């Protein structure tokens, strides 16, 4: 049992560290770096930070309203991360002119629709369930993906 306690503390600490470190890198990129890629890099890292923050809420607030908020935040920013990554890579490789401007709006809309579907979970299509369990000193909420999650991965 003491191994579970230590492991749960390490997991929570590492997720917290990921959220804070990536958030600080995003702020640094936006404020201090004068480079053509700093905006797209900062956006990507800020989204990753918020994604980790949502996951942290799910870890520490299992079974409460905060865990559901964490699930929503994690769903929004995990979907946005793919579009932010595409934007960063296209600018990094110099191929951003091939991507239409409306693609980013489509990505934002898709991310919002996805997160609403995750939280509402119609008929268990998106998530088979959210398990609440004790993990060391943490009561964690962990979702089991459904068929809709597999479709989202293909998108």
Residue ranges and their predicted role:
Residues 1-3:
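Carboxylate-rich, polar loop motifs that coordinate divalent cations or form catalytic acidic clusters
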């Amino acid at each position: 049992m003491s191994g579970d306690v230590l492991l749960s503390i390490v997991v929570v600490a590492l997720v917290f560290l990921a959220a804070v470190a990536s958030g600080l890198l995003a702020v640094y990129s936006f404020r201090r770096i004068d480079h053509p890629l700093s905006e797209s890099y900062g956006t990507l890292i800020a989204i990753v930070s918020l994604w980790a923050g949502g996951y942290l809420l799910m870890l520490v607030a299992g079974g409460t309203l905060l865990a559901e908020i964490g699930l929503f935040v994690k769903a929004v920013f995990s979907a946005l991360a793919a579009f932010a990554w595409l934007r960063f890579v296209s600018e990094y490789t110099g191929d951003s002119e091939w991507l239409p401007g409306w693609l980013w709006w489509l990505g934002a809309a898709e991310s919002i629709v996805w997160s609403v579907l995750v939280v509402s979970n119609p008929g268990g299509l998106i998530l088979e369930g959210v398990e609440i369990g004790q993990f060391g000193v943490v009561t964690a909420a962990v979702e089991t993906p459904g068929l809709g999650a597999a479709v989202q991965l293909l998108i």
